[in-house]
């Protein structure tokens, strides 16, 4: 075969071929670049409606090679767009993904931190053959809504990372591509149960799953299918029920992070199995409703655990388990907000080898911190606040922890000299020192800052710190917060500290500071947000330099001796939310410029010497306020019920680290017996842009008319213009104050009528127009007729319920003035007499018809709003029949119930709820004596209107309380709802309250002998024991006191107001508020730390009542006890002056001082500072019964006990 000769191509041919290939690739690159540029521009045109920073201004239509790879946010590889990162560019518009999906090489898309919006469920796959190449997508922190993009997820089969967090997605959109490894859907509004179940059962390849901060409900499935998951975050949802028994034990071996914090899981975890947690490094089960004595022993199987958080469950109790020391890798331990008791074991100090953060705050721990904790050489954060720790361990133990950066010890009973010198010299890294509400004394060392250069927060409120505020604090250049309130400081504010560049909070209220306030604010820095220096003795003018503090949120200069005018420059402070200048001697006008403060929600100028008219511009911010700027501030509000002793609607305090029991001796409290204390955290938010919520201009000399523009402040809750010189009419525009709760216009010179539309102010709780010149009839709609007559008195032309009836002149002719002789006179007299008779008869018929029609309409209105208590029935209200029978309050407790009782009957029986029938008032409302037509007497309680309860919640609560019957509980006979009015009907107690009989002897005119007092003590204890141990569910009273112990004609004791504290919500929904449960003088020490109510708290309050019976003294009496109270006085006297404790009248009525001493011992046991050492009420009754053997009394003959319950043989008990 002949050989084939291969002829090599000429070099020129090869060059031509190579050139052709290059040209072909170049052409394709140019074409591809043009296509990708077109896709990006299409995306920009379709999705970017606003680009305020001009981030995409450089995107232009170009086909130049390298474009669009040089465009902002675009990254390329091999000339193709591989990544698009537009994060944080403030772009906005309705997102369209279609164009971007046309980029066939796009692997990573990052649009987080913009303002894109739209419904993601409408985003489909691109209309092309090539599949989606995306591997990583992050569109978090935008405003997307709707469900997940199902078609998008289906088309992107290679997607591995998907971040949809911080949007407003609601659910749907699964299944996910099997390639997915990381899924973050946190901080949305997801509630789809199917999505939750799929995420936890269809997660075969997912390694990271974050569903936190959504709205998922229901229970959890197991985790067995999630074989690869290592991070699972289900925190801050609405899930409930119990966890699967082996939820952790059967978890994947790869699981390292597990959080179910902030849900509503409720179960006993004492024996919970954690066996499968060998690789777990973080376990966060905080803020649920888990209960256990100690912690489950199986936790020691989690040997690699670095962070354990069981805080905020409130039901974990017993000693802190020492087996935790077996977790040898533990760096962060938080057991805060539970009920752990006892002392901190020194064995726990073994954890010091690794521990960096230890939080045991808000428990019931006692004793001291063991000395061995001084060896924690890695510990940086130590929080032992809100316990009952004592001793001087700060100086002896904590000062040895040189690594410490954050030290929080507020609300304990730690004593000793000021520990700051030792802390400063031995803990040089400290950034936060919080020693509030302890018993430290001494001065603040002048060289503090030279030893603590990193100090950011110095919090020493509510101690006994004396001396002056050292000017050397200005050397703490990193200082952000200074709180020295409620101490014994004197002298002036050193101007040097006002030059601190980072100072945000300066809080010095309730000291003895004096002099002029330095005019040196905000020259070097405008960081200051909180300036609260109220209730000192400052003089001079308000410094003009404060107007330079443009970031100021809370400014309080109240309760000083300031003079001069209010700076108009305050109107430039756009962040100012709370302005308190009340109780000074300020003069001049109210600056109209304050209306320019676009975030001002609280303005208190009461009790000054202001003159001029009220500027209508104050309402200019209505509809503009968002309110979020003041969120998170700790506050206390002392609400004044009434009276000139305490002017103004109330006092707002900055309340971080202040004990409520110390407020009891504060002048604003102990001078005002009707003042109640509310505490909480501000979370002012408005569904729409809101308005001011508190405005108090009372007790000034303001003149002119009331601005009608105030009616635009639809979120206004408190408006007090009383005690001024205002004239004119009440503006009809006030009917627009839909949220008003307290309106005081008293002691002015107002004329005209009360606007009829006031009957539509459904939240009105307190209304006072007394001492004006008003005329006309009080509107009968709404709740205006339910306020006492005192709120309308001294208005000579005002009439109607609850005042005297209005007299309508029907008009009648007069006698003729000219005489025409006897016959004409007689004839005319007869004619006039007949005419007058006819006119009078006709007028009477008209009046009768109008009254009949009025009462018919009123009956319909009342029928539409009343409900009856139906014990034993599931119905909480009933519909009217066609007969129109007046709706009744069912007297369920009587064996032979009274006939149907209507609201009209109660109104008539109390004479329109007039002052003459008022027999008592308290924190929950006013009580009236009502004598019914059949002779029966009942007590009618008109609840205060500050309530967040809806009809369903109120009715359910009343149905529960109405079924509780016991011989020593005041029975609820029925209730009535009329609009927002709530009336409760109780049995009438002839002898009133124990408080009245004991402490108002002049008016009560009765002395109680020991036998009667003993009878009252046992009866009230029996009633309280029934609530604690025999009611289902058990009831915590929350406000046990002598005024809630009522006495019948035989001086038998009845506990009243049980269940009421839970029913009442102190303020409206714009504040997250918890009313201080209890009354000053009766509040147990642990309530002053975390406001958590317990039966042992009731036991403490009962102990105070028992002391009142033994001593005859009031719980709080500054003239008797000074800064202390009855409990403190008795504990001082009981050691060696016991006989001086008893009421002298008792010594004359009892032959046995031993019995008095036995009852005193019971009282002291009830008043133990440690709740776990107090007896239960059953144990109190047992002790009483033991004493009875010697005393010969028969008060307890019908009382029996067993291990679990309390029963009585009386037929009245249930």
From Swiss-Prot:
Pfam families: Island, LRR_1, LRR_6, LRR_8, LRRNT_2, Pkinase. Gene3D superfamilies: 3.30.1490.310, Phosphorylase Kinase, domain 1, Ribonuclease Inhibitor, Transferase(Phosphotransferase) domain 1. Residues 1-29 form the signal peptide. The chain crosses the membrane at residues 829-849. It is found in: Cell membrane. One of its GO terms (biological process) is hormone-mediated signaling pathway. It is an enzyme of class 2 (transferase). A motif (Cys pair 1) lies at residues 69-76. Glycans are attached at residues 61, 145, 163, 197, 210, 254, 264, 279, 400, 413, 466, 512, 524, 561. It comes from the Eukaryota. A motif (Cys pair 2) lies at residues 799-806. Its EC number is 2.7.11.1. PANTHER family: LEUCINE-RICH REPEAT RECEPTOR-LIKE PROTEIN KINASE FAMILY PROTEIN-RELATED, OS11G0197000 PROTEIN. May be involved in brassenosteroid (BR) perception in roots. Contains two pairs of conservatively spaced Cys (Cys pair 1 and 2) possibly involved in forming some heterodimers. This is Brassinosteroid LRR receptor kinase BRL3. It comes from Oryza sativa subsp. japonica (Rice). The lineage of its organism: Eukaryota, Viridiplantae, Streptophyta, Embryophyta, Tracheophyta.
């Amino acid at each position: 075969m002949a050989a084939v000769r291969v002829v090599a191509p000429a070099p020129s041919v090869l060059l031509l071929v190579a050139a052709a290939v290059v040209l072909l690739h170049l052409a394709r690159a140019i074409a591809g670049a043009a296509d990708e540029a077109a896709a990006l521009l299409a995306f920009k045109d379709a999705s970017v409606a606003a680009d305020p920073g001009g981030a995409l201004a450089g995107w232009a239509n170009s086909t130049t090679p390298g474009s669009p790879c040089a465009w902002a946010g675009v990254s390329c590889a091999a000339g193709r767009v591989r990544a698009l990162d537009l994060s944080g560019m403030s772009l906005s518009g309705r997102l369209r993904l279609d164009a971007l999906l046309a980029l066939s090489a796009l692997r990573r898309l990052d649009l987080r931190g913009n303002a894109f919006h739209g419904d993601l469920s409408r985003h489909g796959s691109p209309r092309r053959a090539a599949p989606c190449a995306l591997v990583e997508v992050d569109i978090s922190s935008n405003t997307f809504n709707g469900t997940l993009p199902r078609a998008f997820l289906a088309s992107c089969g290679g997607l591995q990372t998907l971040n949809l967090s911080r949007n407003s997605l609601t659910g749907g959109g699964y299944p996910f591509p099997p390639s997915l490894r990381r899924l973050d859907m946190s901080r949305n509004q997801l509630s789809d149960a199917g999505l939750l179940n799929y995420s936890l059962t269809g997660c075969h390849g997912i390694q990271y799953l974050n569903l936190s901060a959504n709205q998922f409900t229901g229970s959890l499935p197991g985790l067995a299918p999630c074989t690869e998951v290592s991070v699972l975050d289900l925190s801050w949802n609405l899930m409930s029920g119990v966890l699967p028994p082996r939820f952790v034990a059967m978890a994947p071996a790869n699981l390292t992070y597990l959080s179910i914090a902030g849900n509503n899981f409720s179960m006993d975890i004492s024996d919970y199995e954690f066996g499968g947690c060998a690789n777990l490094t973080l376990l966060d089960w905080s803020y649920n409703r888990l209960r256990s004595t100690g912690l489950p022993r199986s936790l020691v199987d989690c040997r690699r655990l670095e962070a354990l958080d069981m805080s905020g469950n409130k039901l974990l109790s017993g000693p802190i388990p020492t087996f935790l020391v077996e977790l040898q890798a533990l760096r962060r331990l938080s057991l805060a907000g539970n009920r752990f008791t006892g002392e901190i074991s020194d064995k726990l100090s073994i954890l010091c080898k690794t521990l960096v953060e230890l939080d045991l705050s808000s428990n019931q721990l006692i004793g001291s911190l063991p000395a061995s904790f001084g060896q924690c050489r890695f510990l940086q954060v130590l929080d032992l606040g809100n316990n009952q720790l004592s001793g001087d361990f700060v100086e002896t133990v904590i000062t040895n922890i040189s690594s410490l950066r954050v030290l929080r010890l507020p609300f304990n009973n730690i004593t000793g000299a000021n520990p700051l010198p030792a802390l400063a010299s031995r803990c040089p890294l400290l950034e936060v020192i919080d020693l509030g509400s302890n018993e430290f004394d001494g001065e603040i060392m002048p060289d503090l800052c030279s030893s603590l250069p990193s100090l950011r927060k110095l919090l020493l409120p509510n101690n006994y710190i004396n001396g002056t505020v050292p000017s050397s604090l200005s050397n703490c250049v990193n200082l952000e917060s200074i709180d020295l309130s409620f101490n014994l400081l004197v002298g002036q504010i050193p101007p040097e500290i006002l030059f601190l560049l980072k100072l945000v909070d300066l809080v010095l209220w309730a000291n003895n500071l004096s002099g002029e306030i330095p005019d040196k604010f905000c020259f070097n820095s405008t960081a200051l947000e909180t300036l609260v220096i109220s209730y000192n003795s400052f003089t001079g003018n308000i410094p003009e330099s404060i107007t330079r503090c443009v970031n100021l949120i809370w400014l309080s200069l109240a309760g000083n001796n300031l003079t001069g005018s209010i700076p108009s420059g305050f109107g430039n402070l756009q962040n100012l939310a709370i302005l308190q200048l009340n109780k000074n001697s300020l003069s001049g006008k109210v600056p109209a410029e304050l209306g320019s403060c676009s975030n001002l929600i609280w303005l208190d100028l009461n009790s000054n010497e202001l003159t001029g008219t009220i500027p209508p511009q104050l309402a200019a911010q209505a509809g503009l306020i968002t309110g979020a700027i003041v969120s998170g501030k700790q506050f206390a509000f002392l609400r004044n019920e009434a009276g000139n002793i305490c002017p103004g609607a109330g006092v707002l305090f900055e309340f971080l680290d202040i004990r409520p029991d110390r407020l009891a001796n504060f002048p604003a409290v102990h001078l005002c017996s009707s003042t109640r204390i509310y505490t909480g955290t501000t979370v002012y938010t408005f569904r729409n842009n809101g308005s001011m919520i508190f405005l108090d201009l009372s007790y000034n000399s303001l003149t002119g008319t009331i601005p009608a523009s105030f009616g635009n402040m639809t979120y206004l809750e408190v408006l007090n213009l009383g005690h001024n010189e205002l004239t004119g009419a009440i503006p009809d525009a006030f009917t627009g104050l839909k949220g008003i709760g307290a309106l005081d216009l008293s002691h002015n010179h107002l004329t005209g009528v009360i606007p009829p539309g006031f009957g539509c102010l459904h939240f009105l709780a307190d209304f006072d127009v007394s001492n004006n010149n008003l005329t006309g009839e009080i509107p009968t709609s709404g709740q205006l007729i339910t306020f006492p007559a005192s709120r309308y008195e001294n208005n000579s032309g005002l009439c109607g319920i609850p005042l005297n009836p209005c007299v309508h002149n029907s008009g009648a002719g007069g006698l003729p003035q000219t005489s025409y002789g006897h016959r004409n006179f007689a004839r005319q007299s007869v004619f006039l007499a007949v005419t007058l008779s006819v006119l009078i008869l006709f007028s009477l018929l008209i009046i009768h018809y109008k009254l009949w029609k009025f009462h018919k309409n009123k009956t319909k209105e009342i029928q539409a709003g009343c409900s009856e208590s139906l014990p034993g029935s599931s119905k909480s209200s009933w519909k009217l029949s066609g007969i129109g029978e007046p709706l009744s309050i069912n007297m369920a407790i009587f064996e032979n119930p009274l006939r149907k009782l209507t609201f009209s009957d109660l109104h008539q029986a109390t004479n329109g709820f007039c002052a003459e029938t008022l027999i008592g008032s308290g924190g929950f409302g006013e009580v009236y004596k009502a004598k019914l037509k059949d002779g029966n007497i009942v007590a009618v309680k008109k609840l205060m209107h500050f309530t967040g309860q809806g009809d369903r919640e109120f009715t359910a609560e009343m149905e529960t309380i109405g079924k509780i019957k016991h011989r020593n509980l005041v029975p609820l006979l029925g209730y009535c709802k009329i609009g927002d009015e709530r009336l409760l009907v109780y049995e009438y107690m002839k002898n009133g309250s124990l408080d009245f009989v004991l402490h108002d002897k002049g008016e009560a005119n009765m002395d109680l002998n020991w036998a009667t007092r003993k009878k009252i003590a046992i009866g009230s204890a029996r009633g309280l024991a029934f609530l604690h141990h025999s009611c289902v569910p058990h009831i915590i009273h929350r406000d046990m006191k002598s005024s809630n112990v009522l006495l019948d004609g035989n001086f038998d004791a009845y506990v009243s107001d049980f269940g009421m504290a839970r029913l009442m919500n102190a303020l409206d929904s714009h504040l997250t508020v918890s009313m201080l449960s209890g009354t000053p003088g009766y509040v147990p020490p642990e309530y002053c730390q975390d406001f958590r109510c317990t039966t042992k708290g009731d036991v403490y309050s009962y102990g105070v009542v028992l002391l009142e019976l033994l001593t005859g003294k009031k719980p709080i009496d500054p003239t008797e006890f000074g800064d202390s109270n009855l409990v403190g006085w008795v504990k001082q006297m009981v050691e060696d002056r016991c006989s001086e404790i008893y009421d002298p009248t008792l010594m004359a009525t009892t032959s046995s001082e031993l019995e008095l001493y036995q009852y005193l011992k019971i009282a002291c046991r009830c008043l133990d500072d440690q709740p776990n050492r107090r007896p239960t009420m059953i144990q109190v009754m047992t002790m009483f019964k033991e004493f009875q053997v010697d005393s010969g009394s028969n008060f307890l003959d019908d009382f029996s006990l067993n291990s679990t319950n309390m029963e009585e043989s009386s037929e009245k008990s249930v």
